[in-house]
Design a protein with these regions (language model features):
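Receiver (REC) domain active-site loop signature in two-component systems and cognate sites
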Residues: 66
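Non-catalytic signal-transmission and effector/linker regions of two-component phosphorelay proteins
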Residues: 1-16, 131-133, 137-147
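Active-site beta3 strand of CheY-like receiver
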Residues: 55-62
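C-terminal output helix
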Residues: 117-130
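Alpha4 helix (beta4-alpha4-beta5 surface) of REC/receiver domains from two-component response regulators
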Residues: 26, 73, 85, 96-111
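Charged docking surfaces used in two-component/phosphorelay signaling
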Residues: 26-34
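Acidic catalytic/metal-coordinating carboxylates
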Residues: 43-47, 70-74, 96
């Protein structure tokens, strides 16, 4: 099913999807690929860090509950690394209590989507955060050039 695009990805933005649920991975990967994104997959924090070492994605869709290190702890690690801190992290999880949502933002997430996922909503949020990150990067580069 083709979802109406909110905004086409800028030159095939790279999105890392981190989730241990095969059905969620399949659904997200299919939808992202249809929209023109390049998709990287990780099933846990260790794999996610390995993907970051290979290629820094433009955004991360991150489950909070995974085997081993949870998504909140992984997000904190990503945000503590200067070369990765700019990457927007969108949590997607079944944890719906206010304290859990607040923890997602406190750990460095820019957004929080409660499962079950609504693909058009996830795509719209992702496009917005990618656009905001792009504008922020351009501003940082302009300041760097201006000195």
């Amino acid at each position: 099913m083709k979802v109406e695009s909110v905004m086409p990805p800028a030159v095939s933005s790279v999105v890392l999807v981190v989730d241990d649920a095969p059905d969620t991975l399949r659904m997200l990967c299919d939808a992202l690929a249809i929209e023109g994104y390049t998709v990287l997959v990780a099933r846990d924090a260790i794999e996610a860090l390995e993907r970051f070492e290979m290629a820094v994605p433009d955004a991360v869709l991150l489950d909070a509950i995974m085997p081993g290190e949870n998504g909140f702890a992984l997000c904190r690690r990503l945000k503590s690394e200067p070369s990765w801190a700019h990457v927007p992290v969108i949590f997607m999880t079944g944890l719906a209590e206010t304290e859990q949502i607040v923890e997602g933002f406190a750990s460095g997430g820019v957004d929080y989507v409660v499962k079950p996922l609504k693909i058009p909503e996830v795509l719209a949020r992702l496009a917005t955060h990618l656009r905001n990150a792009h504008v922020s990067r351009l501003a940082r580069e302009a300041v760097d050039v201006a000195g």
